[in-house]
Amino acid sequence: DLNVRSNEHARTTYKSYYGPTYYSFNRGDIHYVVLDDIFFIAKSYLYVGYLTEQQLQWLEQDLKQVTPGSTVVVAMHIPTYSREARRKEWGKESTMKVMNNRSHLYELLKPYNAHIMSGHEHYNENYVLADNLYEHVHAPLSTLFWQAPWACDGTPGGYAVYEFDGGKVNWYYKCVGKDKDYQFELYPVGASRNKKEAVVANVWNYDSTWKVKWYENGIDKGEMIRFSGYDPAIYEYCEKNSSTFKHKYLGADITEHLFYAVPETKDSEIRVEVTDHCGNVYTRKMQQSK
């Protein structure tokens, strides 16, 4: 409700149709919590990422019923963390794109093995926040509001799949129309505007526990180097088609799950091997031509 004077009344219509905006339930050995971290500031469409004291008090009491050490899944819209925070560039965080009082949520989740599931941003990102705390930021199936085949970071249209076994959680990203093993894209030398001399891999579900290795003509060359830049496919697509986009502000965005390696020769065979957090290995090959 955009014509109300405060956040307290902004969900009246939603609640009348769908019920509460925060709640919890158990399924199997997992405790699930849904939170509402969009705080409407009663000015146009503007909001900030914020958990009200009412929700924090409720969550504190809710978690008292959960055995310490068990797995808790917490879902919300706006992410708690950001790429700026990971780089310790705190002043560059946008109040509209991150939960501003996240430290108080983290404190409540300390006794548990917690997975935070969020969205909002049109890219895929994962944050290992602590040994027991992990945040999954999900790229939307709609990519760039249905304007492109990829999200702004080059993640193909798709969805996350989570597999629960007792208190254990495994996950992978499933691209629409692609096999489960399609977990990264490999670009040839010259495709990347940031690393023109290198082959580049976009590993969209990467986190710090993954390994990205490369081989040239079968020789192990070690790990590829991670860098920030634009995914070649979405960048080129937006350059060619952005004039037809419904929303003119849409475009490619810099991502941090890119990796590069510079081949020694121009006609070598390149193989990239990606190992995920579960030990699954994904491989792609590319034959270079002079």
Show the residue positions of the predicted features.
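Extended low-complexity, serine/threonine- and proline-enriched intrinsically disordered segments
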Residues: W210-Y235
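Aromatic sugar-binding surface patches on proteins
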Residues: D231-Y260
